[in-house]
Amino acid sequence: ESILVDLMRLALEQASESLSEAIRGESEPLEQVRLGINAHLELLVGGSDKVYVLLFEWRSLHGESRQEMIDLRDRYELLWSAMLHSLSSQGLIRADVDRDLLRLIGLGALNWVATWFNEGGRYTAKDIGDFVWTVIKDGVIKR
């Protein structure tokens, strides 16, 4: 279990660092979300087995180890919550959109890419990121 925990911890730390780095210096909240989507996807499809272990094995953990991973995951999701809150506070998200549900469904959809993405296949990570961004922009963002 300690090997799983170490791999998962590294994956979550890498995810947080990757997201923070992607949005660092960008003050426009819409652009932060777009950059965040792409950073998350790049991490997923970048060939790191740590991410797969995190996504598909975390339920194997128990007790303190499981709680530690939940806490680290929650910290990562807090970065997304802050970006969505910024959009909402600036009136950029439709009033009928639940930010928490948007975050959960959005990250779930992005994470599922790891199960079907094929390097060299029909879609690149950029294609997927652009598509996800278009869906969010056209379905969630106020015009």
Identify the meaning behind each predicted range.
Residues 21-26, 62-65, 74-102, 117-120, ...:
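Hydrophobic alpha-helical bundle segments that form small-molecule/ligand-binding pockets
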Residues 2, 10, 14, 49, ...:
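Short alpha-helical
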Residues 68:
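Active-site Tyr-X3-Lys motif and surrounding loop/helix of classical short-chain dehydrogenase/reductase
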Residues 39-42, 46, 78-90, 107-109, ...:
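C-terminal peripheral helix-coil segments that are non-catalytic and often amphipathic
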Residues 45-64, 115:
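Amphipathic alpha-helical segments used for helix-helix packing
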Residues 2-24, 31-42, 53, 71, ...:
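Alpha-helical structural segments
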Residues 33-36, 57, 61, 98-102, ...:
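Short, conserved alpha-helical segments within structured domains
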